Amino acid sequence: MKRLSSILAATAVCAGLACTPMAGAAQLTPQQVAGNAAQSTLAPLEVTPELEQQTWYQKYKDDSRVEKLQATSPAMNGRKIPLAVIRAKDENRPTIYLLNGAGGAEQDMDWLKLSDAVDFYHSKNVNVVIPQAGAFSYYTDWVSEPNSQYLKGPQKWETFLTKELPGAIEGHIKADNHRAIAGMSMSATSSLLLAEHNQGFYDAVGSYAGCAATAYPVEHKAVELTVNRGGATAEQMWGPFGSPTNRYNDAMMNHEKLRGTELYISSGSGLAGKEDTFSYNVAKGYNPATAALGSARLQVEGGAIEAGVNYCTHNFKAKLDQAGIPATYNFRNTGTHSWPHWIADLKDSWPVFERAFNK
């Protein structure tokens, strides 16, 4: 029934003189999106002392399912970006670009450390590319260069992820021309933005517990707080509040550019679920003191963040509904801003991605 309503909504949009492609009809190739942009060069991962300390590397360094690579970014002065690539079992398979949240691998808060993404996606015979850098960057192109521990030098992540990397990596893994992009928390916003800025490039988008809006006062403050954690400012990233660059990087304002892309969008309510409780954490093996502190923090801090995300995401749904743009929504009655729910999203979004890839 959900799928039928989505089809009917899309059909209604096409009743006018012009009609955009049905959802999932990605048409552009990496070469078309790249234009004249210089391409990334791939090489085996150089294991620096910093990388060697990151849990994801220790966890998967001997796992043949995960190829450890680095890709240069010409737009970021040749910076070498570490990549974890979950390889499909076969050639000519789709590619998912999976983005970490604010702290990323740099803070040991990434998909490979904290989820079963490798087991899950390997079983689906799909390629997954995870950039293991980009903490606090929103994976966008910044207007000025910050100089902090996590953010130093040119930050041209959109250029890297959409123009420099796809041609190189998809050629290397012998992928087909189907692709999706997904992210959680900070990068849930990024996944929507990169799809909007490159219409027709992604078959599907997964936005797990993020906020589409960035150029409204309250939502912009949330962006500012996130970037501040990385030692930079939102003004360094997108210029002054309400500037053309800020508005360009507001997925709510530019929602029309998501038409024709399969969408999976989720949030919890902010109310504690079973995964946020003391007893759940004790059952997972944490000692009582750690479990008590963790559950209290999740229910207070994580609950407040997710309540804001829930408000923002319902506003986004209203905007998409008004425009007749179909999406698959997962609004949970409970759930804080935390990993158990993003791991569930990784799996719950797969039917949406699979449907898009099979068109």
Where are each of the predicted segments found?
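Non-catalytic cap/lid and distal C-terminal segments of serine-dependent acyl enzymes
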Residues: 2-10, 14-359
